[in-house]
Structures are given as C-alpha cells and as structure tokens.
C-alpha cells in the first residue's frame, strides 16, 4: 500500500490545477481594465474574453463603471453584413470590432450596469459561431455619436441661428459648417427633423440649406447662418443628421445559436443596429434602444435598431423599448437570390441582387429552399441543398437534391431559403420616435405581435411585405397574429395607402385566386388615428380584422387624401367584423378592387 502513497499528492495537485482552469467567473479588472480611467481598455477586456474561452468560465463580469474603447488595439475583421453597403458606398467590408466573441459557448457577460463608451466608428461587439451566450445589464454608448443634433434657436428672414448639441462636434471652414467626429467626417448626410410639440420625426432638407449657407460661430455651440429669406423652419425643432454610409453596425451576431440579450441598453448605434444574421434562437429581453436619459439626445440609431436576416428557430422580442431610429426599429426577413444560369440539371448559379446585401452565406448544406416566381411571389417548387460554392461576392452556385423545375424563369425567378426562417414573437414593447415603420416582418412561420404600443411611427406601424424584385427580402407569410396592440397617430409620413397596418407584397400580377399572404389575423387592437386609413391589404387570403376599436384624433391634419379605413386589393376570404368607431365615423369605410364581392364578409355597412 505504501508504494502508492507518493502518488496521492501529485494527483491532488493535478486536480487543483484542472479545477483552477475551470473557474466560473472572470473579472475584466483582473486583466487591467480600470473603470473611470478614461483610458483605452479594449485589449484588456478582449484578453478577459479570451480567458473565458480558454478556461471555459461561465461568467465574464464587468464591475460597475465606465470603460472606454478606442479603435486602436481592436480586432479588425471582414464581415459581409445584410442591408449595409454597396461596393461603391463602402468597398472595404473590414469592421473594427470592439469586443470579439468567437466560437464561445455557455458564457454570460454580466455588465452590472457598466457602460462601454466607444470612440470613433466601431462595431461594438461581434458574436461569431457562438452558442448559449448571454449579455446582461450592460450599457453601450459613443463619446461622439455619428448622429449630429442641431436645434433651431432663432429664425428670421435671411438668418437662422442654431444650437448644436454638446456631443456634436463641428468646425467652420471657409465660412461653411462641417460635422466631424473622432477620426471621421460626415460627408453624405441624411436628415430627419423632430418637432417636440407634435413628437413627430419628419424628413427634412434643413441640413442641406444650412450646410450650403454662410456660417459664423457667435458663441461655443451656437452658429448663425445666412439662409435664403424663404427658409423659415420652426424654432425649437431639432435636425438629426447622420452619414448614410453603413460601414459598421451596432452589434453583430453571426451564425450563432441560443443568444440572449437581456437588459442591454444601446444608446447609439452607427450604420445598422443589432444585426442577427443566420442565427438560431435569439431572445431580446428588456433591451432598450434609446439615448441615455441624461444625454439630452434624440437619436439612438442611424438606421434599424434590431435587424434579423436569415435567422431560424425563434426570435423573441419581449418588453423592449425603441426610440430614436432613422429607420425601422425591428426588421425580420430573409434574402432571395435570383436564378441566373442553369449549370446542369440540378445546379443553379444564383446572384445577390440588392446593392446593400451580398457576400454572406445564404444557403447551407441540408437547407430546404423554395423556388419563387418573382411576378406573383408564388413558391412553386422545393428542393434540398446538397452543395454551395462561392464564385464571387455576388455569385454562388448551389446544387440541389433534385432536378430544377423546368418552369423556372432565369434572370427573373428567385430561390428562398425556407430553413433559415424564424418563428417570431414581439410582445410588450414600445415603439416611438422613428420616421419610418415600427415593425417589418416576413417569414412563413408563426408570428405573434401582441400587447405592444406604437406611438407616432412615421409610416405604417406594422408592414408585411414579400419581395423578389426590390430588396429581395423573403416571401409569403402564412400565420400572423396582431393582437391587443395600441396604435397612436402613426403613418403621418405615409406608407402603403397611408395605413397604420400595411400588407404590401411586391407581386405585379394581382389575382385573388393566387394570393401571396395567408392567415393574417388582426384582433382586439386599439387604433387612435388622425387620418382615415387603418388597414391596407394586398393579395392576402384568410384576412381577419375583428373586434378592433378605431378612435379618430386631431393630432395632425389628415394627409392621405384617402377617405377609406380599409383598402383591400386582390384579397380572398377577408372578414371585417366587430369594429367599434369612436368619434367621427367615416362615411366610406371599405374599398376593394381585383376581388369578388363574396371574398369579403363584413358587418360594416
């Protein structure tokens, strides 16, 4: 027995060493990240992330405080990201990534209320090929957001005086104003104007006028312009100005699985927002996309706030808050590629068509696809992917498990990935301060949009498209429930039919016997609206609008010129019943075209 005793200490040391390698929590402060140091800690936090991957730690903890992150020392990596930039707008797809999580499983980043303060133009965090990652209770902001804010202070014929937000950096050069940031200058700008009296976000040419006018600084942060006499903007309104080039994104989740963002606060996102691309099972829990309350800013995103492209499994968005987007707060879709050439009986050459979406993996071996007629948006055949070969950034060759349909029209019809389509739940959210839509969603799987508030979205609060000739984003929906939501004064900037809810597929051939969308139910909602149009529906079968309340307000003057509450085009088996009108009752409630009388059942006379 004694001859084995000398082995025991060695075994104990081995066990202790192995146990040390599997510690549960890693602290960024142990790697030199110091809160409130205002020094660049990108390499220190990245080292802590890498340690989690090496040891299998379950928690990465950031003690409360502010941590500054600069591009210097950050990871640079090429990513092709959906809906971002063309080859001409941004030839390089290399992103500057603040924090990189690559092939990491079962990790919680516990923010403890800490703030990551970014500098320059950066993609704040990237998750690539991760599984079971959770980001919790973290704030993300930029020292100098790429969106500038300029408030009209005094306006007289020929002179306009403005106040620039303290986070907006500017310079007067040769009598003209320039906007710049930390390592960048704003060149190609898009402008949205905010009216605090009406709480509306409208398109504006105000920046074009100011930037072309002679300017002089009369005090720090106050600039006076010599403007045309007819230029008379409203004093107190604010211009939100940002560069149109989407060269970075707010946060990027690529080809990952089981990702949760909880109590994450995104106070500014440059380019595009939180982009989830070909990822399975994503939960957004109490995520807030809005400026810090103490910042005095209006803008939180240059474009979309949450963008889901080609995802699958479940997308759950619960109790989130969206305010200050210059595009859509939530956008869920896939990507249709056009069939260019038949290589052999089972192989097609396909092309990414939209300028801003290309280069990423759109198909994977084993995926089920549908062949889609662009003119009608019909899915007319299916197949399974056997092999994918990248030819160029725009072109891929895909081999299928069966012969390509003989009726496929090359250079017109498309191929849709049906596997990479998610179920979607959007519940208990608040949408406001956007010039565009609140929610865009196209997926053939189940969609529930329930108990949300849409407050003064500039265009339709909810838009359901299906597109194989414009953005090339997805095909028909089959199961959508819109229930228990409140819509308040939406669509003042327009949208399909100026309607609060718009169902607007891109099909050019409208035939009620060949509908695009199916089974859309709109029930128990309240619409408080200044204009008449509530529902615009095109090419939809099984449309139900039941037990909804419509209240006429006087917030804005009616702008649509459309006296109809409901406009149905090419729909089949539509039902409108149980509608309660409060206030003014329109004399002309329903307009139909390209459909038979029997295809609408209604209790409205």
UniProtKB/Swiss-Prot annotation:
Belongs to the glycosyl hydrolase 110 family. A subfamily. It catalyses: Hydrolysis of terminal, non-reducing branched (1->3)-alpha-D-galactosidic residues, producing free D-galactose; Hydrolysis of terminal, non-reducing alpha-D-galactose residues in alpha-D-galactosides, including galactose oligosaccharides, galactomannans and galactolipids. Its EC number is 3.2.1.n1, 3.2.1.22. Residues 1-20 form the signal peptide. It is an enzyme of class 3 (hydrolase). It comes from the Bacteria. InterPro entries: Beta-barrel_GLAA-B_II, Beta_helix, PbH1, Pectin_lyas_fold, Pectin_lyase_fold/virulence. Keywords: Glycosidase, Hydrolase, Repeat, Signal. Pfam families: Beta-barrel_GLAA-B_I, Beta-barrel_GLAA-B_II, Beta_helix. GO terms for molecular function: alpha-galactosidase activity. SUPFAM superfamilies: Pectin lyase-like. Alpha-galactosidase that specifically removes branched alpha-1,3-linked galactose residues present in blood group B antigens. Has no activity toward linear alpha-1,3-linked galactose residues. This is Alpha-1,3-galactosidase A. Transmembrane segments: none annotated. PbH1 repeats lie at residues 256-278, 312-334, 421-443, 444-466, 477-507, 517-547.
